[in-house]
């Protein structure tokens, strides 16, 4: 122990030659103790950094949840009775090969049953000398698809230094559009790709705080696929729906 070596060193304070070996031992003991202190400090810092990262991640997730709920409260559509929101993000629906100012901007929503894009932006209606003097707010549903019609989704990093997050969807037959390219803002595209995959496989049904109503599941499964009025194919029926409207003749079919 350092205390013992220190006592020996004090006892040999008048004997330089005899004190030298003790001094060497003491230096080694101090160096060893310093190494242990540094290791303990690194371990504590690591624990703190890990905890801080978890706190930051939790705060970020909480912020996303609050923002999603706020957007849903303002949305032009409503969730179905047994539908759960998973994620929402600011997005631009890229209509061509490259993104332009004419592409609709708004919010991309992912639920356990649907993929929804709502345009939500201020559009210039009047300019004076290239300066916008009047705007109008546009908010309307542009895309609404059952998650089962999502065949695939590709995530990609683009732009300078790969700081832009993009999602490219491929939709199945019966969808209103075959493809959908979205530039999302502020969230990771790879994370979104994983969330969409989980929604498609039904993983989120296992994590619900309130179990899925099996009666609603059976009602959706037993729903007609053809319109009883014109014989046209009806849109997919989602859990929680009470009626479905034929896109051909306009008849509302009660489930």
Residue locations for each model-derived region?
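Anionic N-terminal interaction surfaces
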Residues: 1-4, 23, 27-109
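Long, hydrophobic alpha/beta structural blocks
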Residues: 5-10, 14-17
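Structured ligand/cofactor/substrate-binding pocket environments in proteins
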Residues: 112
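Membrane-proximal, solvent-exposed terminal domains/tails of membrane-associated proteins
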Residues: 223, 233-237
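Cys/His-rich microdomains that often coordinate metals
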Residues: 234, 252-255
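Short linker/helix segments within small regulatory modules
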Residues: 236-245
């Amino acid at each position: 122990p350092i205390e013992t070596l220190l006592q020996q060193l004090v006892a040999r304070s008048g004997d330089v030659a005899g004190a030298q070996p003790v001094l060497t031992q003491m230096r080694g003991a101090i160096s060893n103790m310093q190494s242990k202190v540094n290791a303990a400090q690194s371990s504590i810092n690591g624990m703190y950094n890990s905890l801080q990262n978890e706190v930051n991640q939790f705060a970020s997730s909480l912020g996303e949840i609050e923002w999603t709920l706020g957007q849903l409260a303002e949305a032009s559509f409503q969730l179905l009775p047994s539908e759960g929101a998973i994620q929402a993000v600011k997005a631009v629906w890229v209509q061509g090969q490259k993104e332009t100012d004419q592409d609709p901007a708004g919010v991309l929503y992912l639920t356990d049953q649907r993929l929804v894009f709502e345009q939500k932006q201020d559009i210039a209606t009047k300019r004076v000398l290239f300066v916008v003097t009047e705007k109008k707010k546009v908010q309307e549903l542009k895309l609404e698809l059952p998650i089962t019609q999502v065949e695939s989704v590709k995530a990609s990093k683009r732009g300078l230094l790969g700081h832009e997050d993009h999602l490219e969807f491929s939709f199945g037959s019966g969808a209103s559009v075959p493809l959908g390219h979205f530039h999302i803002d502020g969230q990771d595209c790879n994370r979104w790709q994983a969330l969409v995959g989980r929604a498609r496989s039904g993983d989120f049904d296992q994590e619900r705080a309130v179990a899925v109503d099996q009666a609603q599941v059976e009602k959706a499964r037993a729903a007609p696929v053809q319109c009883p009025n014109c014989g046209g194919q009806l849109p997919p029926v989602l859990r929680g729906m009470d009626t479905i409207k034929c896109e051909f003749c306009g008849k509302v079919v009660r489930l």
